[in-house]
Amino acid sequence: RGESMLGAGIHPGDLVVVHCQREAVNGEIVVALFDDEATVKTLSRKNGRTWLLPANPDYQPIDGTQAQILGKVVAVVRRY
């Protein structure tokens, strides 16, 4: 849901395929649990902080310090 990852080619209604893993590296697109809600964002770790970055300038970065990484996005499926 949502348009926060349009710049990464993930559109509303797309299905994401996720490799379940608790760790991810800087720059990977992840599914993270934040405030009891799953979100798809780009992981950024900088100066000891963790950020969940949208790929749409209309959305703000999320302080991901308390977020739990659920997995890494490995594919996107779009229905036509």
Where do the language-model regions lie?
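Acidic/glycine-rich C-terminal interaction modules and beta/coil loop segments
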Residues: 1-80
